[in-house]
Amino acid sequence: MGVKTFTHNSPGHSQEMLGKLNMLRNDGHFCDITIRVQDKIFRAHKVVLAACSEFFRTKLVGQAEDSSQCVLDLHHVTVTGFTPLLEYAYTATLSINTENIIDVLAAASYMQMFSVASTCSEFMKSSILWNTQQEKILDTGQENPVNCNNFRDGSLSPVSSECSVVERTIPICRESRRKRKSYIVMSPESPLKCNTQTSSPQVLNPTPSYAEARNQSVDSSHAFPWTFPFGIDRRIQSEKVKQIESRTLELPGPSEVARRVTDYVACESTKVSSPLVMEDDVRVKVERLSDEEVHEEVSQPVSASQSSMSDQQTVPGSEQVQEDLLISPQSSSIGSIDEGVSEGLPTLQSTASTSVHADDDDRLENVQYPYQLYLAPTTSSTERPSPNGPDRPFQCPTCGVRFTRIQNLKQHMLIHSGIKPFQCDRCGKKFTRAYSLKMHRLKHEAIS
């Protein structure tokens, strides 16, 4: 007679054992490690912490086995961030909200609990999208109630088990200019914000903490670059570009021209001084703006070679000259040419006569720019090719100047950002380009 074998599998055994371990921890039994966070003591079991955290595993495995009690100080986490993670280790349930999400994410990253950190990042992303759309609904509910009702039906909660963005297009409610500008200022991860967002995902397993977070405002520090890159959706941004291209084929009125120029030059966030100017004229004026200011404000005379260099950029039929200027270190951008010409001329962000840059300097200061977003749309079949040589696809989103190479745009963007890495060792003056610093040092050599 053969041996009979019976296998019993209990699905709830692991959860039951974890619950009993949590009871032992709360009662203080068999706790062999003490964790000190901001002068607060937490008792726990080494085996539980080492099983759920690679950080604790590395710390505890190297210690002597005979040490019955050890004390571990965590200096880089807070009590607010550590407490939910300790509860998660013993209960497999994580409770976070918009108030403690930053501390929990920092503690999870420090303790190498990457699955929890990923969940916190997705919650932050969905919470930001949800709160932004709720503000839009309250702001535009009276103007377009039909679209807003459809919007409410499309998003029910800021969080889901997958925390992914719904892959469908929703009716978009327009918001006021004042609302857009305030949102741009409060979001430090992105220099540009468009007024289009995606819908929030549906809830599969909602919890009370998520429901409470629905009515709370999101702090500006929640918008991390790695969780909510640049604050815009690439799909809706491409649709916005297509709509702008299609509008160029129509003949609009004066108000339409003003809105179109504003969208094109400053991504719907800057003011246009002349609303009756066509879009092509504005491009030319923006390109020539720096040269006009140089002739008006510079007190000392400009050399003939430098003035001819800046004038040759917009002369038709000078393809070879223009290409040489783009490659030359003396003329990587229009703004940097002005800085090399005169040391007494203030930078673009401090010039009072340029109304186009006045509103953008506050939000573009000390910001790293995602240059890949500024690739202008390709020339459509209805537009004529540029008479100034090859097309310049790289456009500055602040002043509208176009460049042939991305390196020239990067150099030009330093002017708007206020970053001046090159400093004179004699007088302490800072410059955007190394060539400007070199020309400035010639002054000291001439004086000495």
UniProtKB/Swiss-Prot annotation:
CDD domains: BTB_POZ_ZBTB44
SUPFAM superfamilies: beta-beta-alpha zinc fingers, POZ domain
Bias kind Basic and acidic residues: ranges: 289-298
Species: Xenopus tropicalis (Western clawed frog)
Name of this chain's protein: Zinc finger and BTB domain-containing protein 44
Region spans: Disordered: 289-320
Major subcellular site: nucleus
Biased composition (Low complexity): 299-313
Sorted UniProt keywords: DNA-binding, Metal-binding, Nucleus, Repeat, Transcription, Transcription regulation, Zinc, Zinc-finger
Localization: Nucleus
Xref: PROSITE patterns: BTB, ZINC_FINGER_C2H2_1, ZINC_FINGER_C2H2_2
GO cellular component: nucleus
Higher taxonomy: Eukaryota, Metazoa, Chordata, Craniata, Vertebrata
ZnF bounds (C2H2-type): 394-416, 422-444
UniProt keyword Transcription regulation present: yes
Domain annotation BTB: ranges: 31-98
GO molecular function, one term: zinc ion binding
